[in-house]
Regions:
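Surface-exposed patches in mature extracellular/periplasmic domains of secreted proteins
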Residues: 34-42, 93-99
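Short, compositionally biased P/S/T/A/G/V-rich stretches that sit at domain boundaries
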Residues: 151-165
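Catalytic cores and adjacent binding grooves of peptidoglycan-active enzymes
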Residues: 57, 62, 70-153
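Amphipathic alpha-helical interface surfaces
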Residues: 21-24, 48, 64, 79, ...
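Short, surface-exposed glycine/acidic/tryptophan-bearing loops
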Residues: 40-67
Length: 166
């Protein structure tokens, strides 16, 4: 659905989306076992990109980028530290934490000049080539855990719930 990627400027103009971006976002969704991914900013027209602090010629302007928040199956935000690690595994070209609470992540599908950022520290250069080392996260920490909805009846009382793989 392209509406999720529309520019937030309020103007009615075409939305440009690199088809690789939603494909990789779907991979990220599956890898993290998300309940949802909210796209806070996808495509941006040049004026809006500049208005929100961009250069006016960055990856959002070309439909290559999204600023996202991922949610787990319980509805909790997934740390951008974990999202960054998973995005690295999937092969996003640009990845960065973009807020001080570590809940929002920039991802893009650039094919050169890779960027691994943490805008809490700096927005102008890469801080690492490996988010696992940078954030001190084990690869097993971000593997999606399988969940299963269950219905159980005991003594004519029905219980419903979710089982999560350990």
């Amino acid at each position: 659905n392209v509406s999720e990627f529309r520019c937030k400027c309020g103007q009615n103009h075409d939305t440009i989306i690199n088809p690789e971006l939603p494909e990789k976002l779907e991979q990220l969704y599956k890898k993290l076992n998300c309940s949802k991914i909210i796209i806070n900013s996808g495509y941006r027209c040049t004026n809006h990109d500049k208005a929100v602090g961009g250069s006016g010629s960055g990856h959002h302007v070309y439909g290559n980028a999204a600023d996202i928040v991922c949610y787990d199956q319980s509805g909790n935000r997934i740390s951008s530290k974990k999202v960054s690690c998973a995005a690295q595994d999937i092969g996003f070209g640009g990845i960065a934490n973009i807020d001080s609470s570590y809940t929002a992540t920039h991802v893009d599908v650039r094919t050169s000049n890779f960027w691994r950022g943490d805008e809490v520290r700096t927005s102008s250069y890469s801080v690492t080539d490996d988010f696992y080392k940078y954030y001190g996260i084990s690869r097993t920490d971000i593997q999606s855990k399988k969940t299963k909805n269950i219905i159980l009846t005991i003594d004519d009382i029905t219980y419903t719930g979710v089982l999560t793989e350990k």
